Amino acid sequence: MLNYRKLFWPLCVLLLLRSGLELWQYNLRVTDNDQSLYWLAAHDLAAGRSIPAFVYGQDYNYFVEPWLAALPVKAGLSPVYVLPVATACMALLPFLMFAWYARRNNLHGGAALWLLIPLLLPSGWYIVTAMPRGFVNGLFLFACWPPVQNLAREKLRWLLSGILAAVAFCVNANTLPLAVALLVLTCWPHLRRGAMYFLHLAGAVPVFVAHHFITQHAQQQAGGLLHPKWTLQWTADYFAQGITHISQWLRWLVPGNASLWLLLPLLILLTWLCIYQQRRSLLFALAAVLLVLVLSLGINKLHDGREHLHYPFSRMWLALPLLAGALAERVKLHSRIALSVFAVCAVAACFSIGAPHTNSQAPELPLRIMRIDSLKAKSDELTLFIRTEKINTVVGLGYPEWVGDQQLLFHYTEINSVSAPLFVIPEYERRRTLLSKEIQGKILVLGGDEGKWIKMGEIQRKVNVCGMSGALLRK
């Protein structure tokens, strides 16, 4: 008989060590220009400046990570390094909280399960979930689910469950499968009680109303939106494409990247156990989740991805590992079967140990990837040039060829400069309010062609800075 009680703390330590190792090997060495927006937000918060509800230039994807990073940044740490660490903690916290409360309720096997699930996942999962890009901002909130469900007052529990599920969904829709499963499992014993439905709705409806007005406010901001949210569409063509390429959405979410050949047997085993043990609530939750996941394959937004760590399709289904824990912890499993399942998953996981981390710049990627040490060297060169020439404004042109490099370079230099000049990218400026600022003094323009430079001011001399051609202008 396995003694699961003794596994809890060793598994916690192993999980934290694994996460730290993955951070050190990749996320603290490689970044992209989408992450640079979160640097700016954390830097602004640390300096006491307000930030928008959503990522700059958008009316979706709430800023959550910068708020967690603001205090360390204010203490003097760089947001470039603080944010990946904070985001990795956000990804792990739900697993740790579910495990802690399972242990507290003497469900030691369930606690071990919650810790083993992330431990068995490929390196890609750790890398993707440590990117401050809003991938795990909604799932992170489900760390509050176990303490809410352990409240003694039933009606307060229902009210807070409705609030929590609605907030998580509004923050990021990739939480929907997990929210569906948890709501089914917690509400199942009370299906005939009207108060349960009323209190869940009483919690959820005000959240959706508030989200609507926050979105409207973002849409009415000066300068407009650079990236408005998608108009969601469901089509049979997308659905057929999704079904035939479903492994794209499972990438890095199954031990060893095994995808369907491992997932299907586990799904069949879980279904059989639900039927054999007469777990109707679990069977219904499983069916509801599968329906949500399969139908979602027909939505256009779900197909906005690449087979790449920095823009994965699987970011849409990041709830799957948490779903596995929520469903599997509720079935009774003989220790021999549990060991057999673990052994198969562990063998599969071995295939991803030491797998090479891809930081290559694939041509079809809609963002720029760069090593942080290379970015620092370029930023030092730009900073020296700015100080030497006493530049007041740095303008980036040449969209779309140079915009990723310029965002990374400008944002990194801005957060690391005591008295930074105004940095602006007129053709692709995320902080829309900067477009109304008057450009004055000595201007460094990078990228674009000479015709655009002349329109901005008098050319004093042409330069080449950080591999980009440009000019010094006088307004």
Regions found by a protein language model. Give the residues of each.
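Transmembrane-helix motifs of polytopic, lipid-linked glycan transferases
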Residues: 12, 16, 85-107, 143, ...
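Aromatic- and kink-enriched transmembrane "portal" helix at the membrane-lumen/periplasm boundary
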Residues: 22-27, 66, 80, 94, ...
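Membrane-proximal lumenal/periplasmic loop motifs of glycosylation machinery
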Residues: 23-33, 46-70, 74, 78-82, ...
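Membrane-lumen/periplasm interface segments of multi-pass, membrane-embedded glycan/lipid transferases
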Residues: 51, 216-274, 299-306
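Hydrophobic/aromatic-rich transmembrane helices and adjacent perimembrane loops
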Residues: 177-178, 283-288, 296-336
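Membrane-interface alpha helices of multi-pass inner-membrane proteins
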Residues: 157-173, 179-184, 203-206
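Membrane-embedded, lumen/periplasm-facing catalytic core of multi-pass transferases
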Residues: 344-406, 468
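Signature aromatic-anchored transmembrane alpha helix within multi-pass, membrane-resident enzymes
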Residues: 6-12, 159, 200-206, 260, ...
